């Protein structure tokens, strides 16, 4: 039966992916959001999905309404109208929990790496068999005939608790979202509760001491680099400027060699988790091996472009662990170039909680530039932290730049520029691209 879905906050990464998925399954889909451009909206526009301004007229009693988790009656006219008129709606995670019951569902959770890992799993499985998927970069695919559903499982505010997947990967546990979680133990408890809802197989990075404490009713398979204590082991790594090669064994049995066109040790682990899950679920490893080779990455995860012979990398990294992984990947691919990091802290609460860790991570770059902190709609700037506080803690001299003047970035020869952040760091990137293009056009 065809339905009409209305998404309140359709540009959200998960929301846009779900909208695309339902659209491809033959449903009528529309949504509302702010006017400001966000990288997910291009896919919606290409699919012909209407993006409307917030307006109570968008809410109709016969629509199936899916609301983004950040919207409430006091900050959104559509939610307020629905509440006042008794029109029901589901939150994103509530809808998803019901939706996945019609499939064999495979979740990917973790503090870091879940979008990339979901992307790898979706790419490989959808090339083997009909698969629906929902990736946190705003990408979604829907098929009513699909047996499998791959999805990203988000821990923020325990949104993954409505999910009961057959299989799940957990990439790591780390302290993040300090506006919600009170401690690392609070984060662990959330993941441990989620783990108990897995029914057939849980795949855990075995070298994470927090993950080693996880318990589940489903069998637990550990993956990692070390042979001791892990079921799936990646070994004989060959990291080059064209990608990464490695072998995988399962409890002493060799499963063969694998290649991915990706960089950084973290991506080898992500791929190993996918190999372990699909092997356990009974998929043909030769097909897994074949399709790993063609994984092209996900949006805003080490996305590269060249402007005026200058390499620019765009990455969503907004936590110290993610910054370290991104810079490691850049050094693998560009070992002879200077690594210039341009980082925008995301949320005041995270910046305060992890200030020292951010400084330590950014010290892995050769040069560092900082953009002003991007505050979340969920918080108020109380003046407790400024980006200059982070700059002072970075051992290598860090400069604060303005989006209207990124010319200091030109002071580097033979450099790779790595723009990182979850806010509007892309506006700085675009300013730099325009500057580079103007330099070319002004040459006589």
UniProtKB/Swiss-Prot annotation:
Keywords: ATP-binding, Cell cycle, Cell division, Cell shape, Cell wall biogenesis/degradation, Cytoplasm, Ligase, Nucleotide-binding, Peptidoglycan synthesis
Catalytic class of the enzyme: ligase
Binding site for ATP: 110-116
SUPFAM superfamilies named among the record's database cross-references: MurCD N-terminal domain, MurD-like peptide ligases, catalytic domain, MurD-like peptide ligases, peptide-binding domain
Catalysed conversion reaction: UDP-N-acetyl-alpha-D-muramate + L-alanine + ATP = UDP-N-acetyl-alpha-D-muramoyl-L-alanine + ADP + phosphate + H(+)
Origin: domain of life: Bacteria
EC number: 6.3.2.8
Keyword Nucleotide-binding in record: yes
Pathway: Cell wall biogenesis; peptidoglycan biosynthesis
Gene Ontology BP annotations: cell division; cell wall organization; peptidoglycan biosynthetic process; regulation of cell shape
GO cellular component: cytoplasm
Localization per Swiss-Prot or TrEMBL: Cytoplasm
Protein family (similarity comment): Belongs to the MurCDEF family.
HAMAP family: MurC
Protein's name according to its UniProt entry: UDP-N-acetylmuramate--L-alanine ligase
Protein's organism: Streptococcus sanguinis (strain SK36)
Gene transcribed to yield this protein: murC
